[in-house]
Structures are given as C-alpha cells and as structure tokens.
C-alpha cells in the first residue's frame, strides 16, 4: 500500500476540511453528513477505530445503503486487509459524496461518474452498493487509483459551487 505517512497526511487534510464544513452547517440533522462523520475517530495519536452506525441511525437511504455494502457485505475483507487509515479514506469518500452534491443528484457526482466509468457500470443504475463495493474491491488496493481518488475528493470538497446546496 501507500506509505502510511503520505496516506495519513492526505487524510488529515481532508478530515480537517470536513470538520470545517460541518461546523458551518445550520441544520445538520437534515443531511447525513453528521452520520458519516462520527464513523471517524481522531485523537492525538492519529486515527483510531471506525464507529459504524446501524442503518436505522443513518437518516438517508443513500448513505445507509452505502454503509451496508461497504461495512456489511465487505466487512470480512476490510477486517482482514484494511488498516484504520485505509478505512478512514473510505469514510472520507462517503463524506465527500455527501458534501459535494444534493443526494437526489448523486448521479452527477464526478467521483461517482469516475467510478462508474472505471468499472463500466450502467450510468442509470440504482445499485449504489455496486459502486462502493467496486471501490473497496478494486480501486482502494491500487496505489495509483487511490492517489487519484484522493486528489479528486480534495478537489470536490474544496469546490464552493458544488457545496452551495448546503447553505
């Protein structure tokens, strides 16, 4: 995998941005951003464990389905192959999806389109879990793809126009 220090530096940068945007929200309970954020634990020693909310705790079907498919169907693979830092990247990916567009317009997300193009998935598919499953299975374990995805995520999060629906 990637050098852990490089990976954590990238993740910390994204994490700090996510915290900043969360603090700017007036009505966080209206979106699933907070549900996504509390799966990420951070302390002075760095990233520790990931708390995974149950589907019932997630106030959005899109987000809940993504949790189910990443941490449910792929839990065995994650437990055996992923370090905490890698799981944080997955968490930040979900947060990035929620930050960048209205959930109803998810199909227009650059990252989702990128993943679908990468795996040649039907653009009109409603099988959200397949997208995230492919992310875990095929993209996360390729160093070049992971770096590319981190860069895309950082670009999306920093794009003020794409976050305008939150205001």
Q: Model regions: which residues?
A:
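Active-site hotspot residues in diverse enzymes, especially metal/ion-binding acidic/histidine motifs
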Residues: 1-167
């Amino acid at each position: 995998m990637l050098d852990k220090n490089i990976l954590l530096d990238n993740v910390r940068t994204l994490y700090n941005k996510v915290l900043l945007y969360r603090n700017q929200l007036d009505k966080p309970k209206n979106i699933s951003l907070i549900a996504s954020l509390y799966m990420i634990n951070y302390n002075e020693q760095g990233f520790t464990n990931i708390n995974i909310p149950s589907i019932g705790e997630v106030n959005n079907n899109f987000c809940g389905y993504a949790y189910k498919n990443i941490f449910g169907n792929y839990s065995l693979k994650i437990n055996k192959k992923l370090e905490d830092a890698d799981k944080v990247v997955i968490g930040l990916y979900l947060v990035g999806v929620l930050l960048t567009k209205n959930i109803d317009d998810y199909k227009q997300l650059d990252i989702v389109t990128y993943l679908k193009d990468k795996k040649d998935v039907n653009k009109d598919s409603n099988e959200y879990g397949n997208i995230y499953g492919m992310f875990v299975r095929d993209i996360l374990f390729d160093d070049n793809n992971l770096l590319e995805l981190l860069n895309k995520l950082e670009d999306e999060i920093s794009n003020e126009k794409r976050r305008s629906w939150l205001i």
